[in-house]
Regions:
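Sec/Tat signal peptide C-region and signal peptidase I cleavage site
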Residues: 20-22
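General small-molecule cofactor/ligand-binding pocket signal
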Residues: 36, 87, 109-113
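Primarily the HKD phosphodiesterase
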Residues: 47-108
Length: 173
């Protein structure tokens, strides 16, 4: 597959993983889509910015580890009274740091799914917005793409259903 097609192929695969995402149009004229690609921190910054906008909930799933900036944003959201829950995927590639202890010490509910290996769809739901993250095949480059769908409540609901399924499978609830 051509490198330019990989992000689009992942997006299609990720949308199919959500129970009804393929049938959920972005309903609002106010909805927007942003795409961030980088070899530096621009993609992570987009995720941090989205979490910073949270008012009610943040659900994060599919990460083998939580990047420190994202973990700090999750803790800040929790301290503002936002309901924050995380499902991490156990991975031998995560190394010693996963962020789980850091998040748990802030009172964030963290479930670890040891049944699934890499790759897993990585997504963050913030109120009625969704961010989908893909990593480059070149692990050494640490490149990632983040697609952010803002003000997309039906898409967020579809991914929330997937989150709660993953959460239950990981032993949460």
């Amino acid at each position: 597959m051509a490198p330019a097609m990989r992000p689009a192929a992942f997006l299609v695969a990720a949308l199919c993983c959500a129970a009804t995402a393929h049938a959920s149009p972005i309903p609002s004229d106010a909805a927007s889509v942003g795409r961030y690609f980088s070899y530096d921190n621009a993609a992570a910054d987009a995720t941090v910015d989205l979490i910073g906008q949270a008012q009610r909930r943040v659900l994060l799933a599919g990460y083998a580890y939580v990047p420190p900036a994202v973990a700090a944003a999750l803790r800040a959201a929790r301290s503002r009274g936002v309901d924050v829950r995380v499902v991490l995927v156990r991975s031998s590639r995560a190394g010693k740091y996963s962020g789980a202890g850091f998040l748990k010490s802030a009172g964030i509910d963290v479930a670890i799914d040891s049944r699934h290996g890499d790759p897993a769809p990585r997504f963050v739901i913030v109120d009625d917005s969704v961010a989908l993250t893909t990593l480059s095949d070149d692990a050494a480059a640490h490149a990632e793409t983040v697609n952010v769908f803002q003000r997309a409540p039906e898409l967020a609901q579809s991914y929330a259903q997937s989150f709660w399924r993953l959460y239950r499978q990981a032993g949460g609830l």
